[in-house]
């Protein structure tokens, strides 16, 4: 358990006995600490830090971040409503969506901020709300991510209005008398800090041509190391050159821009873990592999199968005792050959064993780095497995239930049979 900061072995056994597994576990102290780091991002003229709630939309997580002073970026109208139900004021929510919600008018009139992500969205907003304020998302022409599947900037990404279409943006603005008060970009998750800084400079160059812009969002994508030895972005180091660029912009253009950032992974990734139980241990002979099978898998954690993402893993013996170590592959519970939690780095097509404590049926197994894009992005209900329970470790280490395990009745609630099959 040395490679994982939480939960402790004792907490794992408590979770297994009291709540069952699989269980997502979020650590309140880590969430609050990461929020404080984001809010301290270097800025000369004011900062709004928005939590990209798609990373983990749990009401408990949203409530913690809101109380810490974070605002919200929602990727759909449904997320915006979900944030409000968790207690986030609508004026602290920005909607940045690929798909315009059917109730856009309702959301805007409630106070939700709108961020147009295409010329069509900008035109539609102008038709519905002439003369109103909004921001626009721009694709600056480059991107960066921990893999091509998380790169959301550059010519191969559909996110945002292409930076060369500024004249069309201005034409739509004039036609509907819109106030473009905000400019937004986001280039990927796990971004190279140098590319991120270069992108910020490009965005400021575009801002110079938009005299109404008062706030500039640089998005998120701050690299977070989940595995031991992996680097994480130091926000103070990455942010200081950006703050200096904002100061230079103010000197040259007479505008002191309010800065926004939009972290998701940075805030939540290492504040979450997945607790599972070992249900079998099998092997494929002397020339094969030793497998640990667990009662979780791609139905709870899709990132390894999707990206070849790496997560720290630890076996927790059912009783405290000394054991040796062995090389294992960890397999999920789905009837799917790709449901393996130990792929080669960035290559889900290959396998890579892990040196783990000798595992026995009934042991606990903890997967770290599961606070972001795990509960929010699983192969939900595959093989008809129910959604896992979610827990919050309070400041004193006590686990609290924040989402019940899905029941079979809930899983089937929306299914209907036509009369012909009755």
What annotation goes with each model-predicted range?
Residues 31, 54, 76, 107, ...:
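Conserved, mostly hydrophobic/aromatic
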Residues 127-128, 205, 211-213, 237-240, ...:
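Acidic/histidine-enriched ion/cofactor-binding microenvironments in catalytic or ligand-binding pockets
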Residues 254-422:
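Charged (often Lys/Glu-rich) extended helix/loop segments that serve as interaction or gating elements
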Residues 55-57, 78, 99-101, 118-120, ...:
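Active-site-proximal loop/turn and secondary-structure-junction residues that shape catalytic pockets
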